[in-house]
From Swiss-Prot:
GO molecular function: pyrimidine nucleotide-sugar transmembrane transporter activity
Position of the signal peptide: none
Cytoplasmic side, ranges: 1-22, 78-91, 141-149, 202-211, 269-321
Purpose: Mediates the transport of CDP-ribitol. Does not exhibit CMP-sialic acid, UDP-galactose and UDP-N-acetylglucosamine transport activity.
Record keywords, A-Z: Golgi apparatus, Membrane, Sugar transport, Transmembrane, Transmembrane helix, Transport
Family: Belongs to the nucleotide-sugar transporter family. SLC35A subfamily.
InterPro entries membership: Nuc_sug_transpt (IPR007271)
Name of the coding gene: slc35a4
Any one GO cellular component localisation term in the record: Golgi membrane
Name the record gives this protein: Probable UDP-sugar transporter protein SLC35A4
A Pfam family recorded for this sequence: Nuc_sug_transp
């Protein structure tokens, strides 16, 4: 059985060393929340005349390359002696699965929005919280108590409320928003949420079952990610320059998302996908506060309701006995 603690295991260390590791772990989670929450504001800062000026496929490819390079540096520093035992196609092959699933979902996101409006997409995409928890429970054989299942559904409710109207631009409020969801759109959304949960849970399962260094596992994972995203870029990009539209803010996005990808690998190796779900939920709140501070967007009652629900979910999952 895998641990469901939010902190990594520190039982073999002295109390002071264990405490230090818990503090560092907590700071890492806060950093991850901040990076997740700042992604949308950073995208906004990149826009020129209201449009995104760069190729999204180029940015995603550079994020994968950055994660690979950082993992390679850490591997050469920390795990070089284990190279011979860690390199084989048998160990590498499982990492092709999440790379393909992530690639499929990236394309599915675009296709789904032909069958529903963006607001409905944002609200319904929160179903991946439940799909991830269900698949985590099934594939990793983690039986969640009724109390913990309730906390998962509280995260779902918080995500729905936040997506529906947690923040609001008072200058662009309109009552004429055309909300619609078609049956094909709903079915595609269910597929998207299942694939999202499956890719995350499969990655966690692979990271935990293989007895090789995490840095080597990351190299395998990001190698396939580079192949998939390079293929996507070459097939979708126009004849524009690869770095066309890049600014300082774009590079901040690339480096921060690369760092967050490495943090997520560590979270899934030492903790689990439930911790990851809490990080993503808290990042919504970080996004709301940053949007309020940077862009003077209005925090609505639904935002504060989401804050309460997430706080209650944390207490129910980790605090109640």
């Amino acid at each position: 059985m895998y641990s469901v603690n939010i902190e990594p295991d520190g039982s073999n260390h002295s109390p002071s060393r264990k405490r230090l590791k818990q503090i560092l772990w907590g700071l890492m989670l806060v950093l991850s929340v901040t990076i997740y929450g700042s992604h949308a504001p950073l995208i906004y800062l990149c826009k020129v005349n209201g449009e995104i000026p760069f190729s999204s496929s180029a940015v995603v490819l550079l994020i994968e390359l950055s994660k690979f390079v950082i993992s390679l540096v850490f591997f050469l520093i920390q795990d070089w002696k284990s190279l011979k035992a860690s390199v084989s196609w048998h160990l590498a092959a499982p990492y092709a699965v999440p790379a393909v699933l992530y690639g499929a979902n990236n394309n599915l996101v675009v296709y789904i929005q032909h069958f529903m409006d963006p607001s409905s997409f944002q609200v319904l995409s929160n179903l991946k919280i439940v799909s991830t928890a269900v698949l985590y429970s099934l594939f990793l054989r983690q039986r969640l108590s009724v109390r913990r299942w309730l906390s998962v559904f509280l995260l779902l409710a918080a995500g729905v409320f936040y997506s529906y109207g947690g923040i609001q631009d008072l200058e662009k409020v309109s009552s004429d928003t055309n909300l619609y969801v078609t049956l094909p759109g709903l079915l595609l959304m269910l597929a998207y949420c299942l694939i999202s949960g499956l890719s995350a849970v499969y990655t966690e399962m692979t990271l935990k079952t293989q007895k090789i260094p995490l840095n080597m596992q990351n190299l395998y994972l990001y190698s396939f990610g580079i192949i998939i995203n390079l293929t996507a870029h070459l097939t979708s990009s126009k004849n524009s320059d690869f770095f066309d539209g890049f600014s300082v803010w774009v590079w901040v996005i690339i480096l921060s998302q690369a760092l967050n990808g490495l943090i997520m690998s560590l979270v899934m190796k030492l903790s689990n996908n439930i911790t990851r779900l809490f990080i993503i939920s808290f990042s919504m709140l970080a996004n709301g506060f940053l949007s309020f501070i940077l862009f003077q967007l209005q925090l609505t009652a639904l935002f504060f309701l989401a804050v309460v629900l997430i706080g209650l979910a944390v207490y129910m999952y980790y605090g109640m006995k």
